[in-house]
A protein has these predicted regions:
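N-terminal ordered "arm"
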Residues: 7-66, 79
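N-terminal accessory interaction module
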Residues: 44, 54-55, 60, 66-94, ...
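Short loop/turn segments at secondary-structure transitions that flank enzyme active sites
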Residues: 65-67, 90-92, 111-113, 185, ...
Length: 427
């Protein structure tokens, strides 16, 4: 019930009758204040009139008055700034740390709001607010999706900043590790990130002009050249040469063992997405030129970015998906849709993060422009919103809706969602 009271207070969904304190003094809410997501009073800098006198301060909200004492606020000076205690049941008087009494307001949640909130909580169909989506004003939809898109980019920027710290502020290394993770396309994302974290970048830089040696580094540290794993597939001349080369590189650069190859997942994967193929494409990207991220910073169009991400394989993989198992001849290039997913999940967040770190608004704007120009992703989340009547055109739209599901819908945070707000107040 308390979270509903927060909602009612924030949006001033008060009953038509005059508000009064529990002592009968009239209350006029001029400004409910700014909601506080952290520790401390629930709303900051509210502006009220109590019995005609202007008060400016903080608001605390509880279901019962006695929760004030149960939470220890009566002895916490942080809460001495509270000017009004809002409750749904007033079962006791409350005081500040100096014993001074604090006014209380008995506030009930409107029945209509309670009913609609219950509907959202028990809805089987996703999204729960689907009955009203098609009728929402375009401005409401656009403004919320724009905010969600920024929220998602900010969230990704925080993760990239953490990775950057682990990489000693080396943007190229951090970019490649993130690129590798997203080459897993979901199912093998964790495995690719584990693998990329083992890569000795400075050692590999010394052999960047030799694709075979880069492949030896890559497959060796991926655990795919281990004898037990190779025998599960089939050894052939190429895999044995790679294995021999990796052992040499291990000794030369004092490199540790590769990862556990059982972390790689193959079940229900299309052969084009097998780890062997994606590793070969990453090796091609790594070998064809250094400072990939720096070159992406100079790419002003999506066409330029796609060219830089043109990933192929060495000749061996044109007729193999696994070691020692020949297949029909087929060039293993990365499809345009896969490239676009890499741009959405790797390039765009890095451009945005770089712009934030360097105070380069141009980079942040370019990141947003790329999302607007790219087509929307196609997955079950996006299809659900589209089926509910929400227009999904660009990757900016789809990224916003993914953020909406993961951070609001899945967590049942309808009270913090603008679509949820529209649902609760509809007639």
């Amino acid at each position: 019930m308390e979270h509903l009271l927060h909602y009612v207070w924030k949006h001033k969904l008060f009953p038509l009758k005059v508000l009064q304190t529990t002592n009968g003094l009239p209350v006029e809410v001029i400004d409910p204040g700014l909601q506080n997501p952290n520790a401390g009073p629930d709303f900051f800098n509210a502006k009220l009139k109590i019995d005609g006198a202007l008060w400016v301060g903080n608001i605390e909200i509880h279901t019962h008055s006695s929760d004030w004492f149960r939470h220890g606020h009566h002895s916490d000076k942080t809460y001495d700034s509270v000017i009004l205690h809002v409750v749904s049941e007033a079962d006791t008087e409350i005081t500040r740390s100096n014993g001074e009494q604090i006014p209380q307001l008995l506030l009930t949640c409107p029945e209509k709001v309670q009913l609609h909130y219950h509907e959202l909580c028990v809805a089987d169909q996703y999204p729960a607010c689907h009955p009203i989506l098609a009728s929402l004003p375009k401005l409401t939809i656009h403004s919320w999706l724009t905010a969600l898109q920024t929220e998602r980019l900010e969230q990704k920027a925080q993760l990239i900043t953490q990775r950057l710290k682990h990489c000693n502020s080396n943007w190229e290394d951090a970019f490649f590790i993130t690129l590798a993770r997203n080459f897993g396309f979901g199912l093998n994302g964790d495995a690719f990130e584990t693998w990329a974290g083992l890569l000795p970048f400075r050692a590999m830089d010394k052999h960047r002009n030799d694709l075979f040696q880069i492949e030896a580094f890559f497959y060796g540290l991926a655990g795919l050249l281990e004898e037990t794993f190779l025998k599960r597939e089939q050894e052939d001349e190429y895999s044995l040469r790679l294995c021999k080369e990796f052992r040499y590189l291990q000794r030369k650069f004092e490199i540790g063992q590769g990862m556990d190859a059982t972390l790689w997942r193959f079940l229900r994967l299309r052969p084009e997405n097998f780890p062997h193929i994606r590793l070969a494409q990453l090796a091609y990207l790594y070998q064809k030129g250094d400072k990939l991220f720096s070159r992406l910073l100079e790419a002003e169009t999506l066409a330029d970015v796609r060219t830089l991400l043109d990933a192929r394989t060495s000749p061996y993989w044109e007729n193999h998906y696994l070691f020692g198992r020949p297949s029909s001849q087929k060039e293993k290039t990365m499809g345009e849709r896969s490239k676009d997913l890499i741009i959405i999940n790797t390039v765009v967040p890095f451009l945005y993060t770089y712009g934030l770190h360097k105070t380069d608004e141009r980079m942040c704007e370019r990141a947003g422009r790329f999302l607007e120009e790219l087509k929307a992703e196609s997955n079950h989340i996006i299809r659900s919103w589209s089926d509910a009547g929400l227009p999904v055109v660009s990757a900016a739209d789809s990224q916003a809706l993914i953020q909406l599901q993961k951070e609001y819908c899945d967590k049942r945070k309808c009270l913090y969602c603008r679509f949820g707000y529209e649902y609760l107040k509809h007639t």
